[in-house]
Structure formats: structure tokens, C-alpha cells
């Protein structure tokens, strides 16, 4: 795992990884002012790798991503050079004229999906896509799959079904929703796997008890 962070938080993230003994974190990389700078930082960090490895990009603002989604992305990379995660759009999407604030079009919702992360790629694919993008003076992007779609249109992009729980933390009220979803997920894990498995590798702290543990 490589964590790409803002330069101001490099030391803090290193400290957290050390204190919590996050052994899976192999690299902590410096990001930039634009989202794609972070992607490029990760791509360049593995550029010297001899094999065409799989790279999986995930936004930290989606903390409830599941093992199933990640596993499905890895599996689909066996067939595709690029993979996205998405769920069907449930709201009607309108195209609005920003000058007049009038509806210009209402696309067929049957073909519309809400994109999520992670997004997964063969290293050779995403590296070449950004190589082409960076020589385009009009290059703009907020999405890595969008870079592949625009600059390597011959590369098909597979789609893995996402989950509603894999929501993005964008606004303050999202913190409340995510906190409740996390608690609900924790309860579900106990019901599904049993208390013993759910508590494995966890630290239990007991508060209260006037006379201490073991008092008869």
C-alpha cells in the first residue's frame, strides 16, 4: 500500500503508520495541488517496476469500501487494462444551461451510473494515458478512468458494481451518515461472523466498575 498525502501531512501520516504498526503501508508519497498530481506520484513511484503490475487508486474520503469491491477490481484486471466502480443512478439527471438555468436535456437514466472508487489499472495503461495527457495543453481531469477514456480510447474500461455504503465524504453532514453506517456495519459483522471473529485483532477497553476487575 502506498499513501499519497499533502506535503503538510507527510510527517503526521508517517507517525500514525509507525504508532499503529501498519505493516502493509510500504510507501508514503507526496501529493500535489491537483488530484492528478497524486496519481502521477503513485505511477512514478512504481515506474521502474519490471512487471506490468496492477495499480488500484482509492480515495480516502470513501472509508467504507469493501473487500468484495477490491477483489472484484483485481479479478477484472485479468481481462481489462482499466477498471472503474459504479452504481446505477437513482435520481433523474438533468443537463442544465448554466447561463439561463434552464433544462437542456434529460438523459436516459438506464445508461447512467454514479462513479465511485477504487479505480484500477495495468501500470502500462495508466502510465501511457498520462504520458499522452501531459502533452495536451488543454488537459483537465478529475478522474483517472477519464484520462484513459480520452487519451487511450482503444482501451476498454470494465465496470465493477459498487455499493451505496461506499459513499464519499464531501459535506459536514456526511460525517454523521458515515458514522452511523460504520456502526451499522460493525453490528452486521458481529451478526454475520460471530463475536469471536468480529473481535479478533481488536483492543477491548472496559470503563466503569467501582472495585476493579476481579473483585468478588
Model-predicted segments: where are they?
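Residue-level signal for inorganic ion chemistry
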Residues: 42, 59, 88, 122, ...
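Conserved core of the sugar-phosphate nucleotidyltransferase
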Residues: 64-158
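Canonical Rossmann dinucleotide-binding motif of NAD(H)/NADP(H)-dependent dehydrogenases/reductases
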Residues: 198-216
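Short, structured interface segments
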Residues: 168-188
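Short beta-strand-to-loop acidic/aromatic patch adjacent to the donor-nucleotide binding site
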Residues: 50-61
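Conserved N-terminal catalytic core of the sugar/cofactor nucleotidyltransferase
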Residues: 1-52, 136-137
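A short, basic/flexible loop-to-alpha-helix module at the beginning of a structural domain
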Residues: 186-201
Amino acid at each position: 500500500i502506498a499513501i499519497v498525502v499533502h506535503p503538510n501531512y507527510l510527517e503526521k501520516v508517517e507517525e500514525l503508520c509507525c504508532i499503529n504498526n501498519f505493516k502493509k503501508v510500504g510507501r508514503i508519497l507526496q501529493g500535489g495541488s491537483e488530484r492528478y498530481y497524486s496519481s502521477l506520484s503513485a505511477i512514478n513511484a512504481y515506474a521502474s517496476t519490471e512487471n506490468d503490475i496492477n495499480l488500484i487508486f482509492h480515495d480516502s474520503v470513501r472509508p467504507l469500501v469493501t473487500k468484495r469491491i477490491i477483489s472484484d477490481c483485481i479479478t477484472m484486471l485479468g481481462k481489462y487494462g482499466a477498471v472503474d466502480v459504479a452504481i446505477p443512478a437513482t435520481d433523474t439527471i438533468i443537463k442544465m444551461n448554466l447561463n439561463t438555468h434552464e433544462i437542456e436535456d434529460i438523459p436516459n437514466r438506464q445508461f447512467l451510473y454514479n462513479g465511485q472508487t477504487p479505480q484500477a489499472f495495468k501500470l502500462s495503461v495508466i502510465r501511457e494515458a498520462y504520458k499522452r495527457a501531459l502533452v495536451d495543453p488543454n488537459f483537465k481531469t478529475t478522474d483517472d478512468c477519464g484520462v484513459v477514456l480520452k487519451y487511450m480510447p482503444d482501451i476498454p474500461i470494465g465496470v465493477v458494481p459498487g455499493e451505496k455504503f461506499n459513499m464519499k465524504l464531501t459535506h459536514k453532514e456526511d460525517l454523521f451518515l458515515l458514522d452511523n453506517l460504520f456502526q451499522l456495519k460493525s453490528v452486521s459483522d458481529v451478526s454475520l461472523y460471530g463475536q469471536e471473529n468480529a473481535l479478533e485483532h481488536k483492543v477491548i477497553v472496559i470503563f466503569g466498575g467501582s472495585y476493579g476487575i476481579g473483585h468478588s
